[in-house]
């Protein structure tokens, strides 16, 4: 078995042994270790250990594996209509020779998977904007989160942007509307977030800088700047404070489900980074449902400085 794969952003920072199982099914850990030691599994043509983590756009090669490949559930292929392609093209903030920036709508995945169908990569793969190339996803943005999202047009651009995200040289600002009144107007959250890799419990450090832009007894509008990039970090941290984000059906309190909004009130508002001494700043307008809830909850938003 000789195969080559490109790691997508949904698997960024995943251990190579776990990633291997995702690709070829159930395989004994000892056999994976053997393949790694003998160089039958390599990342970017280099020998690695089982603890090595894959990064977005890494190239993983399998050489002469004598393990019979098991059936892995295939991703659902999405064929977008012309109307869907046009509606997403209308959300583009910037389109240059290296990448596209758009204001992603809530409810659409970045990439396809075994559970998700409608996704940006498949949509823009059919767009004339990516004619002669293909869209590369360079960072994560949850399906239900709206706002600034970037797709590269070339492998070189994808590798550069991915490294900027990994090295925390991309500065991200989110806006969230959460239940209740936050006690502290600004500061820093440092939390230990728990996730599971199979049966293994993993604790990850999470850091976010926050500032309350407006608040009352019913709700708070919060500016969030994540320093780390843990999965569901902002949602988990607000939930841990007992003040979950409106519309969050996963991280919610029992008494916050009443009159729950259809949309998650978490928006990727702005992204900043520097390439070749050129500053790039991209801002995504708030969706109508977000503005409507601001008005309903009597919260004011005058823009970020």
Predicted regions and their residues:
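RNA pseudouridine synthases
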Residues: 1-305
